[in-house]
Amino acid sequence: MSIKIDLKIFLFVFLFLITSQIEMYILLMIFAIIHELGHVIAGLILKFKPEEIRITPVGLQVSFSIDSIEYNEKVNRAKVLNIKKAIIALAGPMTNLFISSIVILFGMFYKEIQYTYIYQVVIYANLLIALFNLIPIYPMDGGRVLKEVLHIIFGKKKAYKVTYIISKTVLILLTMLSSIAILYIHNIAILIIIAYLWYLEIVEIRRYNRRRNIEKLISSIENKEHSLIDSTTAK
């Protein structure tokens, strides 16, 4: 298992420092790491192996691998692999929602803590991380769940295409709403997050285009092979 650091994290730290929001950023990073641990635990339970851990400006990102024999078994069992991937994607946001629920429940029994700073920030931070990650923009958790569900319904090829269209549409709408919000809230953090989402979207568009080109190339080679076989058979 390899560990990599996204150097853009230092840019985020600098931007949050100059905007006097570094404490909030550190707190969000802590709960973002807990969020990712939810993915890891779910992956281990479902017999996936952590392959790479990447430290990014919005927390950790864990890539999983699966044994080739077990992978073939899962493929043969139809949509089991897609369901498991969707469960792993949901595990992170559910972890944050669970933490918020526990803290809220604790506050119901001990009402004096409801007005403390830490109580409100823990709830706010975890709800923010959960809702942010559930946005249907790939490769966010919501986008991953969407892709796996669409894969089950329509198949792999159409799932990628529809996920790409939905992701881009949602991101454009989110950018428009955020632009309006900045005028009233005057919080540069919103701008930073939107910019990072666009960066992720551009990276995924490039991967999507590369994937399509490879699929077209493979399809072209297969068609040529079939044509050669047919012509040889005819002779």
What are these regions (language model features)?
Residues 1-23, 67-68, 80-96:
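Topogenic membrane-insertion module of multi-pass membrane proteins
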Residues 3, 17-76, 121-125, 135-140, ...:
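Small-residue-rich helix-interface/hinge motifs
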Residues 7-10, 91-102, 166-176:
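Core segments of transmembrane alpha-helices
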Residues 12-13, 24-33, 122-126, 181-201:
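Hydrophobic core segments of alpha-helical transmembrane domains in multi-pass membrane proteins
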Residues 20, 91-127:
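Membrane-anchoring/interfacial helices and their immediately flanking loops
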Residues 35, 55, 92, 133, ...:
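Divalent metal-coordination and catalytic microenvironments
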Residues 46-55, 142, 206-219:
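A cytosolic-side transmembrane-helix exit/cap motif
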Residues 148, 152-235:
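C-terminal transmembrane module of polytopic alpha-helical membrane proteins
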